[in-house]
Amino acid sequence: MNPARHSNFKAKRVTRNYVQTIQAPPSVVHSLICPVKEAEWLDGWDYSLIFSDSGFAEKGCVFTSRSTGEKDTIWLITKREDATCETNFARITPDSRVAEVTVRAEDGGQQTSRVHITYTITALTEAGNRFIENFTADNFAKDMKFWEATMNHYLETGKALSQSDPEHWLKYESGEEGKK
C-alpha cells in the first residue's frame, strides 16, 4: 500500500551527520565497514548476507539486519570505493522508513582516520515519522559515539564493547528514546 495515495500521510525526512576519530588508517577502517566484519566489532549486530560475490562488502552486496520488534531491514551497497574509502548504502525497514547511509574515512594524521557518517532517513509510514521525531541529533550522536568507541576498542583489543541496550533502535519507534 502506498500511504501517500490512501491517506493524508505526509512523510518526514531528517539528515544527521557525525565525524568519528578512529585509531587506524582509512583503509583499515574501510575494511571494517562490512556486514560480515561488523559482527566482529559491533556487539549485537545481527545480519544475514543475501548476496555478495566476494563474501564481504562490495557494490551490489545485499544483506538484512534485524532488531526485535521490527521487520528485517534490507540493505544494498550502492557504492564501494577502496580508493576513497567510501561506502554508500540504501536501506529499507518495511512499514517504517528508507535511508541513505554514507560512510567515508579520510586520513586524520598519525595513523588515525576521520570517519564522516551521514544518515538521511525518510518515513514510509506514521511509524517511520515517529522514528524520525525521536531520531534527534543528540540520540544520533550517542549512537555514533558508541560506534566510535567500540570500533576503537576492537582495533586495540580485538574484541567488541558490550552494548548495554541492544534494542535501542526500537526506542525511536516507540518514542521512548526522545523522552530522555
Q: What function would you assign to each model-found segment?
A:
Residues 4-8, 62-64, 89-91:
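Short, P/G- and charge-enriched loop/turn segments at secondary-structure junctions
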Residues 1-55, 176-180:
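Hydrophobic ligand-binding cavity/cleft-lining segments
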Residues 40, 67-124:
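Hydrophobic-ligand binding "helix-grip"
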Residues 28-33, 39, 63, 77, ...:
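Hydrophobic pocket/interface hotspot
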Residues 14-16, 57-59, 71, 97-99:
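Residues that act as N-cap/strand-start positions at coil-to-secondary-structure junctions
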Residues 15, 19-21, 46, 62-64, ...:
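Ser/Thr- (and often Asn-) enriched beta-sheet segments in non-cytosolic proteins
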Residues 1-3, 56-60, 82-88:
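Short Pro/Gly-enriched beta-strand edge/turn motifs at strand-loop
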